[in-house]
């Protein structure tokens, strides 16, 4: 009732305290906080409140912030205009009312914005982290698949090389076996030819020896026959002479 907050709240929400009543002056003199006249105190309180709320006051009418700062610095006896430390019940009621009004003027600050935006930021960061983890997992899976494919290719190439080497070895072994068989056959043929040659030679020798024996027998028979012929011729001659 003793403090009238004047000001156009729709225009800027500025609170101006009218301290022209004598009761408020007495309470301010008793509390040693407000030591100025009603006109100067109203302008100073409005300037301090406007500086605290960072809202231009209607009394300034577009004046520079430096003027308001100088006026606030000149009036050091007012104390801190943000909180009215009045010991009287009237001033305490007015201070509570002013604090309630100032608390009612809820201007969105950067901290509130950051508080409201922090869950979204955390959600976005969590989503980004999950996406990055998924991308990393996909990259790891791709690398694992590549490594597995390379290992499979290496294993298949090694298996094919081993198969080729085994086939070559088997072919060499077969060729060696074939060559060995051919060599054995050739050796067997040579042995047979040698044996047959020896047998043929022996047969020839036996045959020649038999022929020589027969020739000798024929010569002996011829000589015997010649002797008999000569004897017969001699007997014929003797018979003719008789």
From Swiss-Prot:
Comp. bias (Polar residues): 18-45, 88-125
Keyword field contains DNA-binding: yes
Main localization of the protein described in the UniProt heading: nucleus
InterPro entries for this protein: bZIP, bZIP_sf
A Pfam family this chain is assigned to: bZIP_1
Basic and acidic residues: bias regions: 66-79
Location in or out of the cell: Nucleus
Segments for region (Basic motif): 185-216
One function term, GO molecular function aspect: DNA binding
Region (Leucine-zipper): 225-239
PROSITE patterns cross-referenced by the UniProt entry: BZIP
SMART domains membership: BRLZ
Domain bZIP: 183-242
Protein task: Binds specifically to the DNA sequence 5'-TGACG-3'.
Annotated protein name in UniProt: TGACG-sequence-specific DNA-binding protein TGA-1B
Organism: Nicotiana tabacum (Common tobacco)
């Amino acid at each position: 009732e003793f403090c009238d907050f004047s000001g156009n709240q729709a225009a800027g929400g500025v609170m101006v305290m009218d301290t022209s009543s004598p009761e408020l002056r007495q309470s301010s003199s008793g509390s040693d906080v407000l030591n100025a006249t009603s006109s100067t105190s109203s302008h100073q309180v409005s300037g301090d409140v406007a500086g605290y709320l960072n809202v231009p006051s209607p009394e300034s009418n577009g004046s520079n912030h430096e003027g308001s700062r100088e006026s606030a610095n000149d009036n050091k006896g007012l104390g801190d205009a943000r909180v009215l430390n009045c010991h009287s019940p009237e001033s305490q009621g007015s201070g509570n009312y002013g604090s309630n009004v100032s608390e009612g003027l809820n201007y969105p600050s950067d901290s509130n914005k950051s508080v409201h935006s922090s869950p979204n930021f955390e959600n976005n960061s969590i989503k980004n982290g999950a996406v990055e983890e998924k991308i990393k997992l996909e990259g790891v899976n791709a690398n694992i698949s590549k490594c597995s494919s390379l290992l499979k290719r290496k294993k298949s190439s090694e298996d094919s090389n081993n198969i080729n080497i085994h086939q070559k070895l088997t072919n060499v072994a077969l060729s060696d076996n074939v060559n060995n068989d051919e060599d054995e056959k050739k050796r067997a043929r040579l042995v047979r030819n040698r044996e047959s040659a020896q047998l043929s030679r022996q047969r020839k020798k036996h045959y020649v020896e038999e022929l020589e024996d027969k020739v000798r027998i024929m010569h002996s028979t011829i000589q015997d026959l010649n002797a008999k012929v000569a004897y017969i011729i001699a007997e014929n001659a003797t018979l003719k002479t008789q």
